[in-house]
């Protein structure tokens, strides 16, 4: 049996009812919801779903680069699967749990590092290649073994985010693999939902460099064609192991401009848009368009460079947080499609405690804190803001509202705009795009739990804000090492409470994940998640 040891890779990567779909359109047909756990049903009856995305579309290799979680949601998790997956069709009043995908079960040894996965039998890649333990080892070699002919530095850097904890891996027999982590990792099964598995046959045929032109996985939809960065077309995988999806085809189009997305929906150019312009929601509803929302693990915020004065002073950071009117942004600018974020923990997470809501709108307190910090006359600063992209809502209008609020207490902000790919590309290198003092962005902290240390841990490759608190690092380490989920949640709650008090970020809003759907679209189940299971969706003729 071959046993693989991982060679180090330098990281550069960067309340609903249980079965309800939150379709709030008056006078139009409500969305049909599949019964939790039901197979999706046969393909060939569901039409073509055309989705207008908010950002540039991803490179559809298994690491799904350049488009954030929107690219993974709409493309990556449709073509590929990992050993595990999120259960997105059940319990939509709480964050989703991880269940088996290409692995049907797993066990962890007493050392809390050695994991044995029992693989699902009878699964085929979309090119007909059987899935087995050799396929798992092949893909891990591609990500982690610099001696593999299919390894590239780009793959290795991107895979580090979720596969970086793996020390070694091996096939024990055709249906089992053993993965050993460098340290105890209680959230390892969740990490593996993001370590996507490609067909070895397809990768060998094209080579890693060209695989994104002909990607092949085991997911519910198979690749058909693409116009790079602009449009990706997929077709139903009729041999999908969970049952063929109801749709015949899935097309994802890049439409970064919110007005263009709404126009495309009204004209019939698309029948689903991600993040409709909040100003358009009432008129869309009046036209019979369905608006789906749900709370999820989301935070829109500014990362402040705490290594630079005056953001190095926690009094200044707290002052900025008291200076902004989150409620006005959520209710007036975003028309209720987001909730105010008064603390670091997003509302739709186990780490959220209402008692931790801290930063009410209090300009007088903001001025007092600035005076205590010796900045009674205020100061000037800069922030880089994306013009759109994954989960970013209306980034420029939000930033302009924050700019006005901060100016009222003497903090003069220069806004510098760039595209989402440039911003996250710089962040993946631990840099701030355009040399600003802060960056604006959206993020998830818990999908998976591996992400939390990337954003608040002092050893993160994404250390753009240079925030460091030894107590936070210790709580993160304690949580990561524990297989006990309630203990991890308690540690995370304590860590984010400290982050709230330290205020290394400007906490703004928690998105409610709105999307607008044609009345002909049926069957969406909207979970408390960035991700979606599209197998239950169909489009009526």
Per-region residue spans from a language model:
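Structural transition elements
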Residues: 340-373, 390-397
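N-terminal lobe/hinge region of extracytoplasmic solute-binding protein
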Residues: 52-110, 216
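Aromatic- and charge-enriched surface segment that lines or borders ligand/interaction sites
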Residues: 104-149, 178, 310-312
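Surface-exposed binding/hinge segments that line
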Residues: 118, 137, 153-202
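Gly/Pro-rich hinge or "lid" segments in bacterial periplasmic/extracellular proteins
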Residues: 87-93, 187-245, 249
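A bilobed periplasmic-binding-protein/Venus flytrap-type ligand-binding module shared by bacterial periplasmic
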Residues: 235-238, 296-319, 323
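Detector for C-terminal structural segments
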Residues: 41, 227, 324-350, 394-403, ...
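Ligand-site clamp/hinge motif
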Residues: 206-212, 231, 237-283
